[in-house]
């Protein structure tokens, strides 16, 4: 080894020891005939002092981020010079030798100062030397080890599934890879290990997991990555309760890494109640502000805007004090989300109603509205009217915006909830409106994925009333973020074919795209279920990071670009020719 100790482990008890440290120059300070270096490695920082003429002369050439090795004697710092802000602050190393292991060019940014994200990502190897980014990646390693330990206790088998496979419709666009040896054909990078893990259950593996890399060619979004990671699990001979139990055990141990004990059992809410009360299938329960149903209240209204299939409201405490300009900005906020605006009523100090909408109400509506929605004098009532799903979603977003503006969210709080019993199907046109891809060509598509089992009591309604069918599914939500999604799976060919048919995948097309899975179901497929945790988001929450990019070693930007390697990049004409990307596939006779 080139060093005897880590820079962050030395203490008073090590005084008098001869040590060799290796790391990077974090700071250099010249004090008239003495040079002080803060030497940093992955374990921390130790101050090295250069007094002896030989090493002092060498130390003059040191600059920030030079990689060096220092030998010397551990000494207790002179009285008054201790640094209580670092664990090694009571000692220093009196250097007797210095070796420069690697010089550093002038830095593109100072590691102890803020820098723009694109610059940080271009020089990510420098960014990760900083305490915050580096600590987040190291925490991720502990998170992986902790999850593996829990699953090992329960006899799970870690199995790697293919990362190049065939393209199958799973709800997003595939990344395609040309198959050189079969010109005109393509592999696809997997959007998830879903099909393979189900086949592993048919294979008798019974308890499977992997930390899986997944790929989705989605439209660019601020906090999405084209390549992401899941903790993927599947179990045979289980129901939803079994999967939820092991999931809660994993989550409990993960959050213990940061000193928080998750109260057990984690509460549950139905999908329908989550949408009705919070306007979201991933509600943030760190604060109140529930939505109020107003459809019946306005059932006889003459106000045409509220003559809608759904009318709802959310109250902003103290919101009546907002200036007109701010209230106008709320309208722009709603329009950015695809709505015409956000109607509002102000409750004045004497309890009367103000604002442009209130004049359209009847006397009876005005007299009872504040009581109905739970508003007090000085509050603002926001409304949305129209189709229930989109109107509730707008109010749910407004609920979160209100909480942020009023400081209602405790940043140190944790709120977990299982959202259960979602619909199995949704209208395909509604899915495509929000950027999702319909699996088939039918009027309905899967809410989760096409392999989710309906709850048994709804099997007879699959064809006759798809919109009423509930899925045997469960999502785990933390602080308004979905961090895991799971379900009991279909394990019967006839049920799977019926679900495909509702989504517009008739037997011939289903056989072409999923024949291998359907055939496997004919060989005694066991009941099975599982869950996949969004590992990047889970790690970001544990590390206290806003963006998942902070917990990925080499992430892409929101535009899907890697500033470090300048990927994606064009290919040469020779590469294009060899790949066969322009070759038409041979017709199957």
UniProtKB/Swiss-Prot annotation:
GO biological process entries: aspartyl-tRNA aminoacylation
Positions bearing the site annotation: Important for tRNA non-discrimination: 31, 80
UniProt-listed Enzyme Commission number(s): 6.1.1.23
CDD domains, A to Z: AspRS_core (cd00777), EcAspRS_like_N (cd04317)
Known catalytic reactions: tRNA(Asx) + L-aspartate + ATP = L-aspartyl-tRNA(Asx) + AMP + diphosphate
Annotated residues for binding of L-aspartate: 170, 216, 448, 489
Primary location recorded for the protein, binned into one broad class: cytoplasm
Residue span of region Aspartate: 194-197
Domain of life: Bacteria
GO terms of molecular function: aspartate-tRNA ligase activity; aspartate-tRNA(Asn) ligase activity; ATP binding; nucleic acid binding
Compositional bias ranges of the Basic and acidic residues kind: 575-589
Gene Ontology, cellular component aspect: cytoplasm
Keyword Transmembrane helix among record annotations: no
Chain segments carrying region Disordered: 563-589
Localisation: Cytoplasm
Primary role: Aspartyl-tRNA synthetase with relaxed tRNA specificity since it is able to aspartylate not only its cognate tRNA(Asp) but also tRNA(Asn). Reaction proceeds in two steps: L-aspartate is first activated by ATP to form Asp-AMP and then transferred to the acceptor end of tRNA(Asp/Asn).
Complex formation: Homodimer.
Family indicated by similarity: Belongs to the class-II aminoacyl-tRNA synthetase family. Type 1 subfamily.
UniProt-recorded name of the protein: Aspartate--tRNA(Asp/Asn) ligase
Provenance organism: Mycobacterium leprae (strain TN)
Gene: aspS
């Amino acid at each position: 080894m080139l060093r005897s100790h880590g820079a962050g482990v030395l203490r008073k008890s090590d005084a008098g020891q001869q040590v060799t440290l290796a790391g990077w120059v974090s700071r250099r300070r010249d004090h008239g005939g003495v040079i002080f270096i803060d030497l940093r490695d992955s374990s921390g920082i130790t101050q090295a002092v250069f007094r002896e003429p030989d090493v002092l002369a060498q130390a003059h050439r040191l600059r920030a981020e030079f990689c060096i090795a220092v030998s010397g004697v551990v000494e207790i710092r002179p009285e008054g010079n201790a640094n209580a802000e670092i664990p090694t602050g009571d000692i220093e190393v009196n250097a007797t030798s210095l070796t420069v292991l690697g010089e550093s060019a002038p830095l593109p940014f100072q590691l102890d100062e803020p820098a723009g994200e694109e610059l940080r990502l271009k020089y990510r190897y420098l960014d990760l030397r900083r305490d915050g980014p580096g600590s987040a990646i190291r925490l991720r390693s502990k998170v992986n080890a902790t999850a593996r330990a829990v699953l090992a206790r329960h006899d799970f088998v870690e199995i790697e599934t293919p990362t190049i496979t065939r393209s199958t419709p799973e709800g997003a666009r595939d990344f395609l890879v040309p198959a050189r040896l079969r010109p005109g054909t393509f592999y696809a990078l997997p959007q998830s290990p879903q099909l393979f893990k189900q086949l592993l259950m048919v294979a008798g593996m019974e308890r499977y997991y992997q930390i899986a890399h997944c790929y989705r060619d989605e439209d660019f979004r601020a906090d999405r990555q084209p390549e992401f990671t899941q903790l993927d699990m599947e179990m045979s001979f289980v129901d939803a309760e079994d999967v939820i139990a092991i999931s809660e055990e994993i989550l409990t141990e993960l959050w213990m890494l940061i000193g928080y004990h998750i109260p057990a059992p984690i509460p549950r809410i139905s999908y329908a109640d989550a949408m009705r009360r919070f306007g979201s299938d991933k509600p943030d329960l760190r604060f109140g502000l529930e939505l109020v149903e107003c459809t019946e209240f306005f059932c006889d209204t003459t106000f045409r805007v509220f003559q809608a299939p759904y009318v709802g409201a959310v109250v902003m405490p103290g919101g009546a004090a907002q200036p007109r300009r701010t209230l106008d900005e709320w309208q722009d906020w709603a329009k950015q989300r695809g709505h015409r605006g956000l109607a509002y009523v102000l409750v004045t100090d004497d309890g009367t109603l103000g604002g442009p909408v209130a004049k359209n109400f009847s006397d009876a509506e005005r007299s009872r509205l504040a009581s109905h929605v739970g508003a007090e004098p000085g509050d603002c009532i926001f409304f949305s009217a129209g189709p229930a799903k989109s109107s509730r979603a707008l109010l749910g977003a407004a609920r979160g915006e209100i909480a942020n503006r009023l400081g209602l969210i405790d940043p140190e709080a944790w709120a977990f909830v299982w959202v259960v019993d979602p619909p199995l199907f949704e209208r395909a046109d509604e899915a495509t409106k929000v950027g999702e891809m319909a699996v088939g060509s039918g009027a309905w598509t899967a809410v989760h994925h096409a392999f989710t089992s309906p709850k048994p009591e709804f099997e007879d309604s699959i064809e006759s009333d798809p919109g009423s069918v509930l899925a045997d599914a469960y999502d785990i939500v933390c602080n308004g973020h979905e961090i895991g999604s799971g379900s009991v799976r279909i394990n019967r060919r006839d049920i799977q074919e019926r679900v495909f048919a509702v989504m517009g995948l008739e037997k011939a097309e289903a056989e072409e795209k999923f024949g291998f899975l359907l055939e496997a179901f004919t060989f005694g497929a066991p009941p099975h279920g599982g869950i996949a945790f969004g590992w990047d988001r889970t790690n970001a929450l544990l590390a206290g990071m806003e963006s998942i990019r902070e917990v990925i070693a080499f992430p892409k930007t929101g535009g899907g670009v890697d500033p470090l390697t300048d990927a994606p990049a064009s290919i040469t004409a020779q590469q294009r020719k060899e790949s066969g990307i322009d070759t038409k596939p041979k017709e199957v006779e």
